[in-house]
Swiss-Prot record:
Residues 1-270 are annotated as: Amidoligase domain. This is CTP synthase. The gene is pyrG. CTPSs have evolved a hybrid strategy for distinguishing between UTP and CTP. The overlapping regions of the product feedback inhibitory and substrate sites recognize a common feature in both compounds, the triphosphate moiety. To differentiate isosteric substrate and product pyrimidine rings, an additional pocket far from the expected kinase/ligase catalytic site, specifically recognizes the cytosine and ribose portions of the product inhibitor. Pathway: Pyrimidine metabolism; CTP biosynthesis via de novo pathway; CTP from UDP: step 2/2. Its EC number is 6.3.4.2.
Length: 553
C-alpha cells in the first residue's frame, strides 16, 4: 500500500518546497523505494498555461502533454519516475470536476460544500495521481501542497490532507513542514519566532508536523534548534537545518546527513536498504571542478525573472557536469539589442534564444540570430528561437525582406511562420485550431517522436530519431521551405504524420554549429545523463572559444 508524505510551507513562499520534496524523493529512491511526487496548486486557474511567466515562472510540460508547475521539472530531474498530468492539479481543476458532477446529479440533490465535497475530491485526485505513477504502485507518494500555511486558498488542501491522514491510519502518512528562520543583521542572530507561529498555525488546522525543515542562510545552531523543538512540539532530531548552498544537487546529501529519510521511514514503518548517494556526490564533484569555462548569452524578454527559464538553466548545468565545462549564463534583454545593437554579444562563446510568446522583443532576438550566423558563433534556437532563426535566414539570406510570423504580423505577405490549424495529438486524434481559439489548452503539447535526416548535425547529436516535448501554436510554413533549402538551410527533422519541420540547421560549409529546434529539449534533461543537444552546444561553445584564442595567438 502506498504511504504518503505531505510537504507544507510556512512564513513566506519560494522557500524551496519543490527542491526539498524532490531531494527527499531522491534519497528514498536511492534506498530502493518506488517514489512518485504530486504538486497541489491552490490557484483557481485550471493550469498555468495562460499565466504570465513573471507571475508563475516556467510552465513545465510533461510527456503526456500537461502544462504544469515548474516543480514537476525538479521532480523529474531528481528521480527516475516521469511525471504525468495527474501529478499536478489546481483548485480550478477540483472545482471544475465537482461542478461537473453536481450538474450531472452525482450528489443526488445534496448541498455541495467545501467539506466534504471539495476535500473528498482533493483526496481522490491525490490517490489517483499516486496510482498513475509510471514506476508502478509507489511505496511512497510525496505530496507538495503549494502556498503558505495561513493562506485562505490553501485551506481546503490542508484540510483534505488532515482528513486523508486520519482515514489512512497510523504510520500511513506523515507531515514535513518547511519554514523560514531569518537572520536579522541588526541583531546579529537567527530568529525562531516566525517558525513557532507557522507551526502553531498549522496545528490550529489539526496538523502536527513530524519533521521541520528550517530554511536559513546559514546552519542553525543547536541552541536555536532546541528552542524550535520546545515551542513547536517536534523532537529535536526532527528539526532539520537547511541552509543556502551553491548547488541544489547538494541538498539530498545535506538532508540525509541529518537523518530526514530515517525519520520518514521510521514514521511510515518502512525498512528499506541503506541510502546510496554516491551518484549525487559524483555530480557535485564534477560541477565544482570543471576543466574549462565558457560564456553563453541567453537572449530573451523574461530575463528579469530567471525562473521563467528554470529547466533551460538546469539543462545547461547538466551539460556543464558532463562536459567538465563551467557554463556562465549571461542574460540579455532582447529589447536592449533593438535599441543598442549587438556589440554587447561580441565576447560570447555561444548564443541561445529560448521559447517565448508575443511580438515584444522579437526584432532584438532576430538581431542576435543574425550576429551569431554572421560571426560564426554557435547558435541554439528553441521553439520561438528556431522560428526567428528561419525568419532571419529568409530575410537576410534568401531575400524575403517581409518574412515574418503571423503571430507578430498577421498581414505579412511572406508568412514564413504561421499558425498550425490541424495536427495529430499523441493519441492520433486530429486537433483543430483557428485564430479565435481559446489560449488555454490549444497548443501542440507533449512528447512526439520523429525521424532525423541522415548525414546531418542533428543525426550526429541524436541518432536516427528524436523524441521530445512540445509547447507551441506556430510552425515553419512548408510553402516557403523550398526557397529556404535553396538558400542552404537544412530541415533535419520532420513529423512523420503532418510533415511539420521539427529541426533546422545550417550545413558546416555555412556555419560550424547552428541549430534550431521546434520542441523543448530542456524538459528531458537530467543531471544523471545530461542531454545530447546541450552537451553538443556547450562543446561547440568551447570549440569556438579555442578557435578564437588560436586566431589571436
Amino acid at each position: 500500500m502506498t504511504k504518503y508524505v505531505f510537504v507544507t510551507g510556512g512564513v513566506v513562499s519560494s522557500l524551496g518546497k519543490g527542491i526539498a520534496a524532490a531531494s527527499l524523493a531522491a534519497i528514498l529512491e536511492s534506498r530502493g523505494l518506488k517514489v512518485t511526487l504530486l504538486k497541489l496548486d491552490p490557484y483557481i486557474n485550471v493550469d498555468p498555461g495562460t499565466m504570465s511567466p513573471f507571475q508563475h515562472g516556467e510552465v513545465f510540460v510533461t510527456e503526456d502533454g500537461a502544462e504544469t508547475d515548474l516543480d514537476l521539472g525538479h521532480y523529474e530531474r531528481f528521480i527516475s519516475t516521469k511525471m504525468r498530468k495527474a501529478n499536478n492539479f489546481t483548485t480550478g481543476q477540483i472545482y471544475e470536476s465537482v461542478i461537473r458532477k453536481e450538474r450531472r446529479g452525482d450528489y443526488l440533490g445534496k448541498t455541495v460544500q467545501v467539506i466534504p465535497h471539495i476535500t473528498n475530491e482533493i483526496q481522490a485526485f491525490i490517490e489517483r495521481g499516486a496510482a498513475s505513477a509510471t514506476c508502478g504502485e509507489p511505496d511512497v507518494a510525496i505530496v507538495e501542497i503549494g502556498g503558505t500555511v495561513g493562506d485562505i486558498e490553501s485551506l481546503p488542501f490542508l484540510e483534505a490532507a488532515r482528513q486523508m491522514s486520519l482515514r489512512l491510519g497510523r504510520n500511513s502518512a506523515c507531515f514535513v513542514h518547511l519554514t523560514l528562520v531569518p537572520f536579522i543583521a541588526t541583531a546579529g542572530e537567527l530568529k525562531t519566532k516566525p517558525t513557532q507561529h507557522s507551526v502553531q498555525k498549522l496545528r490550529e488546522i489539526g496538523i502536527s508536523p513530524h519533521v521541520l525543515l528550517c530554511r536559513a542562510d546559514r546552519p542553525i545552531p543547536d541552541d536555536e534548534s532546541k528552542k524550535i523543538s520546545l515551542f513547536s512540539n517536534v523532537p529535536e532530531d526532527a528539526v532539520i537545518s537547511v541552509w543556502d548552498v551553491d548547488s541544489i544537487y547538494k541538498i539530498p546529501q545535506m538532508l540525509h546527513d541529518q537523518g530526514l529519510d530515517r525519520l520518514i521511514c521510521e514514521e511510515l514503518r518502512l525498512d528499506p536498504q541503506p541510502a546510496d548517494l554516491r551518484m549525487w556526490a559524483a555530480l557535485v564533484e564534477k560541477l565544482q571542478n570543471p576543466k574549462h569555462e565558457v560564456t553563453i548569452g541567453m537572449v530573451g524578454k523574461y530575463v528579469d525573472l530567471t525562473e521563467s527559464y528554470k529547466s533551460l538553466i538546469e539543462a545547461l548545468r547538466h551539460a556543464s557536469i558532463h562536459t567538465s565545462t563551467k557554463v556562465n549564463i549571461e542574460y540579455i534583454d532582447s529589447e536592449e539589442l533593438e535599441t543598442n545593437g549587438t556589440a554587447s554579444l561580441a565576447h560570447l562563446d555561444a548564443v541561445l534564444v529560448p521559447g517565448g510568446f508575443g511580438r515584444r522583443g522579437t526584432e532584438g532576438k532576430i538581431a542576435a540570430v543574425r550576429y551569431a550566423r554572421e560571426a560564426k558563433v554557435p547558435y541554439l534556437g528553441i521553439c520561438l528561437g528556431m522560428q526567428l532563426a528561419v525568419i532571419e535566414f529568409a530575410r537576410d539570406v534568401v531575400g524575403l525582406k517581409q518574412a515574418n510570423s503571423t503571430e507578430f504580423d498577421p498581414n505579412t505577405p511572406e508568412r514564413v511562420v504561421a499558425l498550425i490549424t490541424e495536427w495529430y495529438d499523441r493519441e492520433g486524434k486530429v486537433e483543430k485550431r483557428t485564430e479565435d481559439s481559446d489560449l488555454g489548452g490549444t497548443m501542440r503539447l507533449g512528447s512526439q517522436r520523429c525521424p532525423i535526416k541522415p548525414g546531418t548535425l542533428a543525426e550526429a547529436i541524436y541518432g536516427k530519431d528524436v523524441n521530445e516535448r512540445h509547447r507551441h501554436r506556430y510552425e515553419v510554413n512548408n510553402r516557403f521551405v523550398p526557397q529556404l533549402e535553396a538558400g542552404g538551410l537544412v530541415i533535419s527533422a520532420r513529423t512523420p504524420s503532418e510533415d511539420l519541420p521539427e529541426m533546422m540547421e545550417l550545413p558546416s560549409t555555412m556555419h560550424p554549429w547552428f541549430v534550431g529546434v521546434q520542441f523543448h529539449p530542456e524538459f528531458t534533461s537530467t543531471p544523471r545523463d545530461g542531454h545530447p543537444l546541450f552537451k553538443s552546444f556547450v562543446q561547440a561553445a568551447l570549440a569556438c572559444q579555442q578557435t578564437r584564442a588560436g586566431a589571436k595567438a
